[in-house]
Design a protein with these regions (language model features):
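General beta-strand structural signal in soluble alpha/beta enzymes
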Residues: 62, 84-87, 116-118, 125, ...
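Cofactor-binding active-site loop characterized by glycine-rich and histidine/acidic residues
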Residues: 45-49, 53-186, 204-210, 215, ...
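Phosphate/diphosphate-binding glycine-rich loops and adjacent basic-rich segments that engage nucleotide
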Residues: 475-559
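Glycine/charged-rich beta-loop-alpha catalytic/anionic-binding loops adjacent to active sites
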Residues: 51-55, 121-136, 159-164, 198, ...
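Conserved acidic/glycine
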Residues: 1-69, 75, 258, 263-401, ...
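Thiamine diphosphate
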Residues: 71, 130-323, 385-463, ...
Length: 673
């Protein structure tokens, strides 16, 4: 999953190759910094021109005025070793860390040779293979990934730092706090660099925060913080070096606020009317590119002839690169497979066979099996350590494997999940437990828009197992009783499994863990300690990913999820009709072919779901079945679900709310009348 420390990355020949930890002198640094700043500036000038000519679509977010901070960042990091995530205005850092100008042009042109193959545009790229994690537009959401990636690298014994970039506006997000808190609690040496250019799009910092300096927020986490002039590349570079040295001696996060500039609008379409002419004129006087050029001449670190020669060569090369990128073919349009899921050869595992295991014990057995067979595995969540998790499914694991593998995290589901995503990119294999499936809604962005899209836009796996104790029946009310399988099964890129038996639970967790994609396993809480079954796992992971058949029949096909499988079995046992009961088991990507064949045979379909009609997957199952066998149906398909209402608390209300065996039997009788 991760490259070895010290791996070489090709940097454009016009750019410097010197790297930390050997700190450059100011005299050696400034000429190199100017090269990177100037190159970034002229690349963006070309991109703006291509945008106005209609070749670049979407937009162009410019780093004009931010080049000094970006260069200080890029010159401080070791490509392929340190973990980072950059933002809109950090083109110079991207170039210093391995992106070629050609790749940048291809990315903005969204052609067939772009780093994302045209699946993403403009600033949404990176290089996760080399620990440069690509940003998403939801500001703040990449911070926790850098924390997790840095933690995972150091867990492997690597001398690694993290550097996470955020803007002044992004510091208002909850993820900013969650990431800093996790890094502080776990002593992860990540430098949080705040690029403060005084405006978040058009919102001034006076409407963004009240404190004098954003670096003052470090005091609340018990860490260090500084604020510096971000238009001075040497000051940025040398300060980062000093902070890394402090982190080397005492691993802990820190905040560095760089007061930088945005000498243009938020993006190319923004005319920046909200900044006064006088203010913009003052900012232009601080433009770091011409100012560093003048400094080189004043201090005799370069002469006019050398600078002019470099600038002429750079302009010519960038012009040539832009023309070459314009000639590249457009991306191929897929005919079927859009490349949403990563694939690979799955290992053959040791078999597991045991008699009469409770579903909850099957969870514990699966987690123990994972931790025992793979040293990369770590469990993350709330109260999963000494307490053994809310439903005791992690009982004994902390004692057996230690607190560095079964890890209690600070409360904050989005930050925890982002931490896990980053760790998964740097060699760890996290298992995340949400205490209740309901709490997964705290991490919608991380799951649906970061994890689910990762392979599609990066071409790099995101192996991650997420456990969701779900369902009603325990008198817990609306905030602890939801299923949410219908929510998460609607995001391509996620894999979703919903087991009903001990065998299925064990298989789902082990198969989900070894898959190369983010896998969610729903575990119905009511079944944890009320249902038992044998486990007979032969170690074949490929065989796990299939719908499950419980009874064969000729009169009716009944599809049920989770706890409803057991209610359906009870109903069919009582009614004495020939009913075929199926659990799709794999809800995303939904494999429904055997169920379609069953309906083709029986001519009738009943879907039973605990989720309400609006939230469940019953409608989708019926739609897909009808699309294939409409002519074979003897009766219109039916759904039995909970009412479209939150899960009620009182036992009498909850009992009436949940479908049960009696109501299922009544539906079967009606459909077979």
């Amino acid at each position: 999953m991760s490259i070895e420390p010290g791996a070489q990355i090709t940097v454009h020949p016009l750019l410097p190759a010197a790297r930390f930890p050997g700190q450059l002198s100011e005299e050696d640094f400034l000429p190199l910094a100017y090269r990177a700043m100037y190159l970034a500036r002229i690349i963006e000038d070309h991109l703006v021109e291509l945008y106005h000519k209609g070749y670049v679509r979407g937009t162009v977010a410019l780093g004009r005025g931010n080049e000094a901070t970006a260069v200080g960042i890029g010159m401080s990091l070791r490509p392929g070793k340190d973990v980072t995530s950059l933002l809109h205005r950090d083109l110079a850092a991207h170039l210093l860390l391995g992106s070629s100008p050609y790749q940048v042009f291809c990315q903005y042109l969204a052609n067939g040779e772009s780093p994302t193959h045209g699946r993403e545009g403009n600033v949404h790229y990176g290089d996760p293979r080399h620990r440069r994690l690509p940003m998403i537009s939801h500001l703040g959401k990449m911070l926790s990934l850098v924390v997790g990636g840095t933690w995972a690298a150091r867990r492997r014994g690597e001398d690694v730092f993290g550097l996470a970039v955020i803007g002044d506006g992004g510091t208002s997000t909850g993820e900013f706090h969650e990431s800093l808190n996790i890094a502080s609690v776990h002593n992860v040496p990540v430098l949080f660099v705040i690029e403060n250019n005084y405006y978040a799009f058009s919102t001034p910092i006076s409407a963004q925060y009240r404190c004098q300096l954003l670096s003052d927020r470090s005091k609340g986490y018990g860490i260090t913080g500084q604020s510096i002039d971000g238009t001075d590349p040497w000051l940025v570079y040398s300060t980062i070096q000093e902070m890394f040295e402090l982190m080397r001696r005492d691993p802990a996060p820190a905040i560095l606020e760089c007061f930088t500039l945005r000498l243009c609008g938020h993006a190319v379409y923004d005319k920046c009317e909200y900044v006064s002419k006088e203010q913009m004129e003052r900012w232009m006087e601080q433009d770091p590119v011409p100012n560093v050029r003048k400094l080189l001449l004043d201090r005799q670190l370069a002469d006019e002839e050398d600078l002019t020669a470099f600038e002429t060569a750079a302009k010519a090369e960038i012009q040539d690169i832009a023309k070459r990128a314009l000639r590249v073919r457009r991306p191929e349009v897929p005919t079927s497979d859009w490349g949403v899921y990563a694939s690979g050869v799955l290992p053959k595992l040791a078999p597991v066979r045991t008699k009469q295991v409770k579903n909850g014990a099957a969870v514990n057995m699966a987690l123990d099996y994972i931790l025992k067979t793979d040293p990369r595995a770590v469990i993350l969540g709330l109260d999963v350590g000494r307490y053994g998790s809310a439903f005791k499914t992690c009982k004994g694991l902390w004692e057996r494997y230690g607190g560095d593998r079964v890890i209690d995290m600070p409360l904050g589901e989005s930050g925890i999940l982002g931490f896990a995503l980053g760790a998964a990119q740097v060699g760890a294999r996290p298992v995340v437990e949400f205490q209740f499936a309901d709490f997964s809604t705290e991490s919608v962005t991380q799951l649906a828009l970061n994890a689910a899209t990762w392979y599609f836009r990066c071409g790099w796996p995101m192996p991650l197992l997420i456990r969701l104790p779900c369902g009603s029946g325990l008198t817990m009310g609306a905030f602890h009783s939801g299923e949410f399988e219908g929510l998460w099964a609607r995001f391509p890129g996620l894999k979703v499994l919903y087991p009903a038996t001990a065998q299925e639970t064990f298989e789902a967790l082990v198969a989900g863990y070894y898959d190369l994609n983010p896998c969610l396993v729903f575990e119905h809480k009511l079944l944890y300690w009320s249902k038992s079954g044998d486990i007979d796992f032969d170690g074949d992971l490929d065989a796990v990913w299939r719908p499950r058949l419980y009874t064969e029949g000729s009169e009716l096909t009944l599809v049920a999820f989770g706890a409803m499988v057991h209610e359906a079995l009870a109903a069919v046992s009582k009614c004495g009709r020939s009913v075929e009961i199926w659990n799709p088991f794999v809800l995303q990507p939904l494999r429904i072919e055997p169920i379609i064949d069953s309906v083709r045979k029986t001519g009738r379909l009943l879907v039973v779901q605990e989720s309400c009609r609006a939230q469940g997957l019953g409608d989708r199952v019926i739609a897909e079945v009808c699309g294939e066998v409409m002519g074979s149906l003897r009766k219109p398909p039916a759904i039995l679900s909970a009412p479209d209402a939150p899960v009620p608390f009182a036992p009498e209300l909850e009992a009436a709310f949940r479908p049960n065996a009696t109501r299922i039997e009544e539906m079967i009788t009606a459909l077979l009348a």
